[in-house]
Amino acid sequence: MKKNIALMALTGILTLASCGQNGTGTTPTADACATANTCSVTVNISGVSSADFDVTMDGKTTSMTLSNGQKLPVAKTGTVTLTPKAKDGYTTPAAQSTTISSTNLTPSVNFAYTTVPSTGNGNGNGGTTPTQPFTLNITSPTNGAAATTGTPIRVVFTSSVALSSATCKIGNSAAVNAQVSSTGGYCDVTPTTAGGGLITVTGTANGQTVSSTVTVDVKAPVVDNRYGTVTPAGDQELTLTNEGIVKDADNGWRRLGQGVSTPSDPNGNVDIYVKGTVNFSVNAAAGSKVEVFLARTTGSDVPTNDDVQAGDVLRSVASTSGTETFSLDSRRLAEFDGVRKWIVVRINGTQVTYQPVIADNKGPQQPDPELNGVQNAYSNILNNYNNSGLTYVRGDVNVFTGNPSLQDREFGQAPLGSSFVQRRPSGFESIRYYLVPETAFGNKALQESDEMLRAKAIKSVATVVSAPVLEPGTVKATSFSRVIGSGATSTVTPKAQDNVTYRVYAISRDQLGNETASATYELVRFDNVGPTITGSVIRDTSDLPFASQEPERCLSDIATITLGGITDNAGGVGLNPGQGLTFTLGGRQIQAGQFDTNQLADGEYTIGFNSLTDALGNPVVSAPTNAKVYIDNTDPTVNFNRAVMQGTFASGERVSVESDASDGGCGVYETRLFWDTDNGVVDDATTTPAIGHPVQFARQRVTDGAKADSLNAGWNALQLPNGAGAVYLRALVVDRAGNATISTTPIVVNAKITNQARPLLGGFDAFKRNASAQFMSNSNAISGVNGTAVTPNTTANSALDNILSLDSVGTLTTNAYLPRGATETAITEKIRNVGAYGRFDATQWNRIRDYQLNTDPTLRSAYVNAGNLANQRGNNWRIRTPWVELGSSDTANTQQKFDFNSDLLNDFYFGRTFGNNDNVNLFSYDQFNGIVSGTAGAYSFYGETVQK
């Protein structure tokens, strides 16, 4: 019975409206345009911004330029014809006519211009044919379709090609991004002003942009001035974000058309959906009694009086302002979630209005997250690796849900007697994936049994969040999939961090933003770092003839190989089972231990190793400690530019000496120059009256690894009093790999006429640091018992400290020259120089000499001319132990006191550490000596033997 009463009431309203709109008099009807004064033709143009037209009405034609969307005013009803004029470079659309009548005062016409492809360049050479434009058509809405301000319009379009992007706009509103597919796409636009609403869709593909337009008839919503209109609060409307999903909010409302209860017109069935607490307002005359109820029915029609009386009272008040507000807590009737309820407004007990609402406070069905691999060269996945329950991933990984047919759950209980279709939740919207790092695993909220509260907890601690997925996709096995990236090679965002274990959760969402967290999660760990080679090194361990300056780069003769191991990065998946580590050098597989580098030709080599990966395929990230080495078993070369061979000099004369050294391997390290009075002598006696040992007078080191070095120096020629004979200038060159060469050039030194006597020697002593000197007279010989014996401490692997630091002090040294003849009343020659020297340990020098002459494996190398090398060394290395200069003091006085400090290790030691007596002795001094010389070139010497 209640349905008949409602139908009668509705019929009455239509009848009254009809009676009010039609008259029966004979008054002449005025022109509709003159009455409305709003007639116009809207000209919509696509492809160009403006065009020229001939406009014809009532037989009169006018030419004018019209812009896209321009309204052409018309004074009266009738037919208007617009004929486009030709436009260079574009097709010319056909003419169109439209009729303005009382039922259509503001018609619109559409003209589409397309680019005409070029067929040549005008010079007979042809031309470049541009890419043909694609087509883009709006299929919904159509031109002239009705629309309402404030209500979104779903715009659907098709494209002849797959679009890379598309935007939509209506009027002058901001463009919004459209959802695109291979054949078109869709978007939502909302008109804000009434009138002709020009909708423009602009798509981009293959570097071209094409637009399509339609015009809809936008009208303001019909305002129901009757009292009792229920309006939800505008600031609580659940609008869409730029990601195409509804915004997050605990409370809000949204108009949705589900189209369930009226199959004949599903698009017209729009309900207000609410979640949480929503504020409403209702208009009423001041002083009216306003009652607001929440009622339920068994169908889709309005409630009966019995339904209203059985409903919940939301508000009952005497209106004072004309507008009353009330709040609806949609959770109060949770068992009726998803079921239509009615807000009933009763004014003064008689006037009744109705507003249907549907509460939805529950999320959709739970998704089930799963993982699988991505097909690219740098990605890999190991599910449940070694039964650990943990999935290891390299590069990108695909996350999807194993239950693709997700729906919004129908939590509500339909009223007694109603059909199943009464249950209408807001509907499924999207899925998003969240990665929670291991640092948050202890968060107790993640164990929340309420799936919606658990979703909030997951969102609060997740550090990697995917974009929302609104469509399941075409591959059913991986529905609602998203790719998570990791590692430097991946171009995917977002990216997970290496060596962090994550829980992968999925959260489903409905159209109101209610979210449901997955009941399960996947454990995943990302690893994009390969193994590391540790403890592997090859280094020069041959100290003969001298030590390498870069023992892990420059190798000569014997090297020692240490083969380390391989370890995966901390927290990584681990090594690839069954792979072993092998090394090669110059194509030879090398083993741990000593290696004679003379087996290979000189040159740079890279230490190779086999292709190793971890279990995910990550390659080795570090090479051996010294991945590249240089084998250098070739002696450097050195030549004298000055002095001239067999050149003659007077004692005391300054001799200019220049040597040029070069090395084609690791480069020159240092050059030393010596003077010597004996040649071809290999015993270690200190002869008198001459010294008989090479005595250093110049030295130069090269710090930049240069291949060549030139040393310029001067030597004050020395000779015994009244003596004459050969003096040998020697150059010792050492390269950075420890190879050495000696070159010799002889000169002749004759005693100056005033060189008649040696300088007189004072006391001398070499002693331990912080001890006292004990001077005794010296002669031109080396004494082992002169003063306190110098006994170094080398026990217990002693470091080079003050115990091994020595002082040598010489007291007053007096000139021995006397005036000559009756005419010379003053001393004409003076003391010129006092120098301190340490003698290279004789035992070790003999080892070096023997190595160069006999035991060096290079003498048996297939890569050198062994005979020539042996002859060259035989001529140059047969010399006594050299005296190494510790310091000197030039003076023009007739007497000189000197004080020089040294340590036991000689300066050929080159900075290596030592751990036993032999290493200390290898580069040590076995004597500390001094030389005093005068301006006439005479000299005296003295010294003290080191007691070991």
UniProtKB/Swiss-Prot annotation:
Its main location: secreted. It comes from the Bacteria. Coiled coil: none annotated. The keyword tRNA-binding does not apply. The hydrophilic C-terminal region rich in aromatic AA could be engaged in interactions with nucleic acids, and the bound fatty acids and the N-terminal region could serve to anchor the layer to the outer membrane of D.radiodurans. HPI layer contain about 30% beta structure and virtually no alpha helix. The keyword Glycoprotein applies. Residues 1-17 form the signal peptide. Glycosylated. Contains tightly bound reducing sugars (six per polypeptide chain) and fatty acids (covalently bound and located in the N-terminal region). One of its GO terms (biological process) is cell wall organization. The gene is hpi. One of its GO terms (cellular component) is S-layer. Keywords: Cell wall, Cell wall biogenesis/degradation, Disulfide bond, Glycoprotein, Lipoprotein, S-layer, Secreted, Signal. This is Hexagonally packed intermediate-layer surface protein. Transmembrane segments: none annotated. Disulfide bonds join C168-C187, C554-C666. Shape maintenance, possible protection from noxious enzymes or exogenous and unsettling DNA, and may mediate homotypic cell-cell contacts.
